[in-house]
Amino acid sequence: MHYQNVRAAKFIDRPNRFIAHVELDGKVETVPVKNTGRCRELLVPGCTVSLEKGTNPNRKTAYDLIAVEKGSILINMDAQAPNKVFAEWAAAGGFLSDVTAIRPEYAYGGSRLDFCIETKERLHLVEVKGVTLEENGNALFPDAPTERGVKHIRELQRAAETGLDAVLFFVVQIEDIHSVAPNDATHPAFGEALREAAAHGVRVLAYDCDVTPDSLKIRREVPVIL
């Protein structure tokens, strides 16, 4: 996926989870943050961030914050991007070679899972999770407790137990990650649910991405350490 009209700016602060203040061309701008997660380890005063200029002339703010530099690493933090890049990749045959249909927002049980992918032989239910937390070259999820994430894992487990191909798919919005693991220190219940689901047939996959200020593309599979 690609962004249009991307500019670099300096992060100042984040008064709430929806907006940030940045310095652009010597002026302070208020910009929506396309990720309502905590992201405290990323949005550090003085860091460089990437902004995409909006296309709606009537909007109150001109830019959206989409990425941040953490040292020498560029991290895409757009919460909408993982589903978009997965859909592009799956449509191009990256996930499965014999796809006949891709249905987003698929109702299953008591949840809506991100995708139902149909092949000639079976249905594949996929829940996508974007990962932005990096420590020493390894990625962790989640960066904050997510009861919704636990619920999705349990729905996937029920699907796997009925014979469907159920997949939890981590899109790591960072390049050159060595591994992905559940963040047990932040949300032990998520890690416990994930390990139980994997033991009952849920496939847990992770791929990192090629990340530039104006693009994000699924790159290669990386190990998941449960």
Short names for language-model regions:
Residues 9, 113-143, 156:
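Conserved catalytic cores of phosphodiester-cleaving nucleases, focusing on short active-site segments
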Residues 13, 53-58:
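Short, charged beta-turn/beta-strand-edge "cap" motif at the junction between a beta-strand
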Residues 16-21:
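Short aromatic-glycine-enriched beta-strand elements
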Residues 37-50:
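Short nucleic-acid-contacting surface segments enriched for D/E, G, S/T with interspersed K/R
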Residues 56-73, 218-219:
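OB-fold/S1-family single-stranded nucleic acid-binding modules
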Residues 94-108:
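A short acidic/basic microdomain associated with nuclease active sites
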Residues 137-147, 154-186, 208:
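Nucleic-acid nuclease catalytic cores
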Residues 173-226:
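Domain-level recognition of nuclease-like catalytic cores that cleave nucleotide substrates
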